[in-house]
Amino acid sequence: MKTVSVKEIYRQTEQYAGQSIRVEGWIRTLRASKAFGFIELNDGTFFKNIQIVFDEDLHNFSDVSKFTISSAIIIEGTLEITPGAKQPFEIKATNVELEAHSHKDYPLQKKRHTFEYLRQIAHLRPRSNAFSAVFRVRSIAAFAIHQFFQEKGFVYTHTPIVTGSDAEGAGEMFRVSTLDFKNIPLDEEQQVDFKKDFFGKETSLTVSGQLAAEAYALAFKKVYTFGPTFRAENSNTARHASEFWMIEPEIAFADLQDNMELAEDMLKYMIRYVMEQAPEELEFFNQFVDKGLIDRLNHVANSEFGKVTYTEAVKMLQESGEEFEYPVEWGHDLQTEHERYLTEKVFKKPVFVMDYPKDIKAFYMRMNDDNKTVAAMDLLVPGIGEIIGGSQREERLDVLTDRMKQMGLDEEEYWWYLELRKYGGVKHAGYGLGFERAIMYLTGMANIRDVISYPRTPKSAEF
């Protein structure tokens, strides 16, 4: 007898109606009386469960009636259409086998659990409705990203996780070392002698694949990375994690306008794809997590994104009459409250903020003609604020080295990056999308810890 997935049954119901089929999965709920019982079964292939009906004709009816939540079972039976019932169909069981027993102390019983509680059992939370939906959406969104770039002819590039350079110049990096902490070698100046370390130099976990991706963009024209990045930033907030995934495309022969166009196309593609492929999950989020979610996603997918310079945005905020927690001043980063005001109250749609002051942006961003601002952009979306950050990269070697000197960066450390400018270093641009923030936006989940399987945050690496 063919084993059929629950997803196949929901998607191709007519094909299996009246047929004898076999399903495998875990018990979500079970209730039984003296003569019959009902099992809600989930096999992991679909958000919804399938109902199994069993009665006293079953040879092991008494045993099945006592099966516990999360026990793994194999069902054989007939798929029956039930048009007048709560569920569209059910399986009338002819045989039920226990494959793996679940102890009675299984922590996910039939009640609503808080997200805080579920974080304490991160190894079991994918079995809950909310996290089943979150991680299926995450999978679908990841596929959408790859499909979008592959359809556009981008080369998927794998950049190093262990690096000897700081792509952001912020210094918030996790050290990678095999030195004996109890006997650390020192050099003549009594500093740590990293020449004795595994790589012969100071190394860290990457904060971004951008610099390495730029090298490949100057060979393949269009590339993207999609992988884990790490920030040793002691921010214990709902929006920050120490380990997260980044999507970082880089395009050669491109300026800031090309960059913004690509970012807009990518975000819309991802939203539309997830809405098409995960309607049940999004309906769940819309009902239980964020009641305006589907309307907001539709609005973003069908809006033409706005554009405003940083200087214009600051003026709008200062003249708004709104009382912000953080004062708005030219030369300071926009805070989340400022970003949300712009996208939710002023533009009422996603908006790109461009041309930021050079002093609040990274060394590699292209200097504008005013020598005060750089060709940088952030994409702000309603409900979250900044979701994508990017820039046109500085391709002029002399301007780039001057900027690095001003920022106190060691040119020797970036020798290979500077060399890219010597050998056909054409104008190019790119951006970064924090994947977890995208999943927060797609699902309405408010905490980054709830959209990554095993969150890594300050003082937390339990699993």
Swiss-Prot record:
Subcellular location(s) per record: Cytoplasm
EC number(s) recorded for this UniProt protein: 6.1.1.22
Main location as per UniProt: cytoplasm
Any GO MF annotation of the entry: asparagine-tRNA ligase activity
GO cellular component: cytoplasm
GO biological process terms on file: asparaginyl-tRNA aminoacylation
Record's catalysed reaction(s): tRNA(Asn) + L-asparagine + ATP = L-asparaginyl-tRNA(Asn) + AMP + diphosphate + H(+)
Family matches, as Pfam families: tRNA-synt_2 (PF00152), tRNA_anti-codon (PF01336)
Swiss-Prot/TrEMBL keywords: Aminoacyl-tRNA synthetase, ATP-binding, Cytoplasm, Ligase, Nucleotide-binding, Protein biosynthesis
Sequence similarity: Belongs to the class-II aminoacyl-tRNA synthetase family.
UniProt xrefs under HAMAP family: Asn_tRNA_synth (MF_00534)
Description of how the protein assembles with itself and partners: Homodimer.
NCBIfam families the record matches: asnS, PRK03932.1
Protein name as annotated: Asparagine--tRNA ligase
Organism for this UniProt entry: Alkaliphilus metalliredigens (strain QYMF)
Protein encoded by which gene: asnS
